[in-house]
Amino acid sequence: MRPLTHEETKTFFEKLAQYIGKNITHLIDRPDDPHCFRLQKDRVYYVSERAMKMATSVARQNLMSLGICFGKFTKTNKFRLHITALDYIAQYARYKIWVKSNGEMPFLYGNHVLKAHVGRITDDTPQHQGVVIYSMNDTPLGFGVTARSTLELRRLEPTAIVAFHQADVGEYLRDEDTLF
């Protein structure tokens, strides 16, 4: 595992800031246990510094993963967030969408969020902003990108797309071979 380069850090933080904004500092500057981001085989891991120091005794080729996988870099050097980062993204998310019970299953099967499925949405959510999708009982289901702003949402027809699907907890089953 190695630290991220300047370009990798910039790309990663830009993607992460789309969902949690300035709360990135809460991920790194934790008073209880300091954490850092490390790269291993194009995947970015969120690791406690204590666990990272212990892992130095493991050979690089033998190390499969360490910490929480936040996502991976594509071959074109773009960053793609994984569903494994949902717990941390949901904890610090700025914008949220709550879907009704009739919209949970379509979202968990990989479909976009429609207006008919929206129960609530955070006020003043801009267009093309990263959002965390919740069930009505505040269980995080996944995350996506808004297709419309909150103001435009009010006058849309029920079949219009509100948020584009990025990742959902159903991926643990659908992509279990390639996820980790």
Swiss-Prot record:
InterPro entries recorded: NIP7_N, Nip7_N_euk, PUA, PUA-like_sf, PUA_sf, Ribosomal_synth_fac_NIP7, UPF0113_PUA
GO biological process, one term: ribosomal large subunit biogenesis
Species whose genome carries this gene: Schizosaccharomyces pombe (strain 972 / ATCC 24843)
Domain of life of the organism encoding this protein: Eukaryota
Subunit-level organization: Interacts with pre-ribosome complex.
PANTHER family, alphabetized: CYCLIN-DEPENDENT KINASES REGULATORY SUBUNIT/60S RIBOSOME SUBUNIT BIOGENESIS PROTEIN NIP7
Subcellular location: Cytoplasm; Nucleus, Nucleolus
Similarity remark: Belongs to the NIP7 family.
Record protein name field: 60S ribosome subunit biogenesis protein nip7
Annotated keywords: Cytoplasm, Nucleus, Ribosome biogenesis, RNA-binding
